[in-house]
């Protein structure tokens, strides 16, 4: 499972400046309290590519009596480039895995996105609605990627 978003960079923006701004934002964004681990795997100024390994909590439900959540781990890549005369930042989320109910006696359940959030796994047999258990993982993972993409766009828009 891979999520990709190409974010347009205005023609007037210098790509090196854009790369530096995104790198600064990334270093702050992935140290927030819901992020349990944010590791910068690589940042290459020559290719303008940033790769991170993130582990964070995704909360499905949080009440006084029940907290339903999972730890999600994923790789996140930001590539600032020019292709066919257009400047863009490609945001890619890959290698997604989950650790669910880790506080249980058995240490919880580990699984990958391919095992849990694909169309085949997340929908009922008629493909008309999400399954209760797997659907929530798909929805929250897509929401997370959209949030990261939107925050990246906002970061670019400040240049």
Regions found by a protein language model. Give the residues of each.
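Ser/Thr-rich, low-complexity intrinsically disordered terminal regions
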Residues: 1-159
